[in-house]
Curated annotation (Swiss-Prot):
Record EC number: 3.5.1.96
Function: Transforms N(2)-succinylglutamate into succinate and glutamate.
Lineage of the species this protein comes from: Bacteria, Pseudomonadati, Pseudomonadota, Gammaproteobacteria, Alteromonadales
Entry annotated with the keyword Metal-binding: yes
Stored Gene3D superfamilies: Zn peptidases
Protein residues bound to Zn(2+): 63, 66, 160
Family of this protein: Belongs to the AspA/AstE family. Succinylglutamate desuccinylase subfamily.
Active site annotation, chain numbering: 224
Gene: astE
InterPro entries, A to Z: AspA/AstE_fam, AstE_AspA_cat, Aste_AspA_hybrid_dom, SuccinylGlu_desuccinylase
Listed pathway(s): Amino-acid degradation; L-arginine degradation via AST pathway; L-glutamate and succinate from L-arginine: step 5/5
Cofactor: Zn(2+)
Protein name: Succinylglutamate desuccinylase
Matches recorded under Pfam families: AstE_AspA_cat (PF24827), AstE_AspA_hybrid (PF04952)
Catalytic activity: N-succinyl-L-glutamate + H2O = L-glutamate + succinate
């Protein structure tokens, strides 16, 4: 495994050729500046000899068909392995769901991004590949963050692409963080990365980014970088800004961020989540409606169990509508425009 990676510098290829395990962990050095540790398939750590003050996680492929972030992360890993760039921050890359990537599908059995914060082990337990992998990914995040001295800034960007078109092509979900201010620097880092829209969540979830935020105090986000396309069919020029900013972050180059202003970003507050309670749940709008489509107060969004579900606020925008989820799961997130909450 070690020689294959040293020869190819292609960690994604090694991961997809061994989607369940690489066997034993292995490590090697790059010059005299970086220790590389491979903990598992899809799990690689770059440890600078003299690390600066941030611990950075970039995760991708939690959903197997969201390929642009996978290609983006693999490009960064290749550049690090080729020593075209040199890590100055401790950096962990996670390729989330190799089995689903090989399958060309969003999932194998279950949505992995609903299985963190221990949800993987709740009934019915560790019964499928996503649940097993989510548990492992949690252990790698724990190991990575706890291996460094206290007081360092912890960052986790969980990278995705959306299943549908969007009024705002790139957007981020800021996990619920009661008692903690939102980071103006992080919001402007996202804006510099081309992610000019932020959704402030209103409650705990079982997503990967919420896990890192809540358990480790990380500046963590679920980041949507565009629309789903098959592997190799992404226009990677659309991710130049994101690649540049991620490179600056992990190589400790000046970030050159603008000062925070609500004029420079689009901010939304999650006002409610609509879950599915009956098999007959259906939306009233077209299946191809774009993310952030706005509806007026009183508009009937959906019907189920003989009841109508209506827009409650003066205007609500929607993201991630999906009527085909299992009963009990989220069908859509409803948003209202936000004046910046506690942003510092």
């Amino acid at each position: 495994m070690l020689q294959a990676l040293l020869d190819s510098k292609d960690f994604l290829a090694l991961t997809l050729a061994n989607p369940q395990t690489l066997g034993d962990e292995f490590s090697f050095t790059l010059g005299e500046h970086t220790r590389v540790n491979v903990w598992d398939t899809g799990v690689i750590v770059f440890e600078p000899a003299q690390p600066q003050g941030k611990d950075v996680i970039l995760s991708c492929g939690v959903h197997g068909n969201e390929t642009a972030p996978i290609e983006l992360c693999n490009t960064l890993i290749k550049q690090l392995l080729q020593q075209k760039i040199i890590a100055k921050q401790r950096t962990l890359f996670l390729i989330g769901n190799p089995l689903a990537i090989n399958n060309g599908t969003r999932i194998i059995d279950e949505n992995m991004n609903r299985l963190f914060s221990g949800e993987h082990s709740n009934p019915p337990g560790l019964v499928n590949p996503e649940r097993l992998r989510a548990k492992k990914l949690e252990t790698y995040v724990d190991r990575f963050f706890k291996a460094a001295a206290a007081g360092r800034q912890r960052i986790h960007y969980d990278l995705h692409t959306a299943m549908r078109a969007s009024k705002h092509e790139k957007f981020a979900i800021y996990p619920y963080r009661p008692g903690r201010a939102y980071s103006a620097e992080q919001i402007m880092f996202l804006a510099a990365s081309g992610v000019d829209t932020v959704l402030f969540h209103h409650e705990p979830t079982t997503t990967f980014s919420y896990f890192s935020s809540e358990q480790y105090g990380a500046d963590a986000f679920t980041i949507e970088l565009g629309k789903v396309y098959p592997m190799g069919q992404n226009d990677m020029t659309r991710f130049i800004a994101a690649q540049e900013m991620f490179t600056r972050l992990i190589t400790d180059k000046p970030l050159q961020l603008e000062s925070f202003s609500t004029d420079k970003v689009n901010l939304y507050q999650v006002c409610r989540v609509i879950n599915k309670h009956f098999d007959d749940f259906e939306f009233t709008f077209a299946t191809d409606v774009e993310n952030f489509r706005a509806f007026p107060k009183g508009f009937v969004l959906a019907r189920e169990g003989g009841q109508e579900i209506k827009v409650e606020q003066e205007v609500e925008s929607i993201v991630f509508p999906n009527a085909k989820v299992p009963i009990g799961n989220r069908t859509v997130i409803c948003l209202i425009p936000s004046v910046a909450p506690d942003v510092r």
